Amino acid sequence: MDFYKEVEKIFKGYEQKYQLKLTKIDNNEVAFIGENYALGIGWSMDGVDLHYFKLDNSTLSKFSLDNLLNRKLTKIERKGILPSTTIYEKIINELIICERGFNNHFQELLRGETLSSYGNKEFVSNLEKSIIERGLLTR
């Protein structure tokens, strides 16, 4: 399975619509690179992870959207999400949850608008740093 190709199929048209560039980080992670931010989508045995990358003063920061969502979501917001068996279903479920949890802020993220109250910075791997920083700096 090629995770990059799967995401490319799922989000066909997003690159042009939101002026983003889909970039492969590794076999299990891709990023949509915008003008001064990137939205990472990772795949693991635990499911799909969503990350927000921001370049401030030449320092790349990474934030887990999952951690923010888990704190903010209620049982009602998760209602109607069916168990997923394919990458497509998993990503779509995450995006539905993201839309509900952030009151449609996912679309804002795709346009480069930031969410407030980030306090959960995560470790940025060297691979993420080199690929995403290069992508952000060349835009």
Give the role of each language-model region.
Residues 1-10, 22-139:
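Intrinsically disordered, low-complexity regulatory regions enriched in serine/threonine/proline
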